[in-house]
Design a protein with these regions (language model features):
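TRNA-recognition modules of translation machinery and tRNA-sensing kinases, especially anticodon-binding
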Residues: 1-218, 223
């Protein structure tokens, strides 16, 4: 190929004379994974090491699974068109929307599986938010659900302690405070101590008995991470 190559001018000839085809080629730069992808994988790996399975859910959900089966009342502000992105796909049975959280998978998993259950559901969620430094209409969330006989709130705390220490370090300080979510009772938020201040990283609680009652499972057998 090089023997038949025709040089057009003296400048090209100059560079061609200095060209060494025996030199090794340059490595092509490869892209890297997005930080969000990396942390999602790290969190999933932490739960996987504790016996959890990884599931994925639907980004287009129905009002039934996104709200009704999660004990979210009809007059809850989250159902408002200014908080939820509703889709023009309404039929006689379902009102469709872009899921506002990954929690709809709770009901779907409880419908189709029997205890013991240990699952984690990472995925994108959508809310009608004004974009600023801490808010975006598209964001990521990771849902956890554990169902078994006679498991307790202390086991929930222990699971989350273990996850936090795998992600942030074995000496990480954490705290739990009471919080409210319609689909858990009791509910808590969990914070970590980072550079001298507490930062909330998740919400959790025991699955609300009403949310369980919509499935074939018994309320005393459930826990929500």
């Amino acid at each position: 190929m090089f023997e038949s190559f025709q040089l057009n001018n003296s400048q090209t000839q100059k560079y061609a004379d200095n060209f060494d085809i025996t030199l090794p080629g340059r490595n092509i730069s490869h892209g890297t994974l997005h930080p969000t992808t990396l942390i999602i994988r790290e969190i999933c790996d932490a739960f996987r090491s504790m016996g959890f399975q990884i599931h994925e859910g639907n980004e287009i959900e129905t009002e039934k699974y996104n709200f009704d089966l999660l004990n979210i009342p009809d007059d809850h502000p989250a159902r408002d068109q200014w908080d939820t992105i509703w889709l023009n796909l309404t039929n006689n049975e379902n009102n469709y929307l872009l899921r506002t959280h990954t929690s709809p998978m709770q009901a779907r998993i409880m419908e189709k599986n029997n205890p013991p259950i240990r699952v984690v559901v990472p995925g994108k969620c959508y809310r009608y938010e004004a974009t600023d430094a801490t808010h975006e209409w598209e964001f990521h969330q990771i849902e956890g659900l554990a169902i078994d006989k006679n498991i307790s709130f202390s086991e929930l705390k222990g699971t989350l302690y273990q996850m936090a220490r795998k992600i942030f370090g074995s000496d990480q300080q954490v705290r739990f405070r009471c919080d409210f979510f319609p689909f858990v009772e009791p509910g808590v938020d969990m914070s970590i101590l980072w550079e001298g201040r507490w930062i909330e990283i998740l919400g959790a609680g025991m699955v609300h008995p009403k949310a369980v009652s919509y499935t074939h499972l018994r309320a005393h057998e459930t826990r929500h991470d």
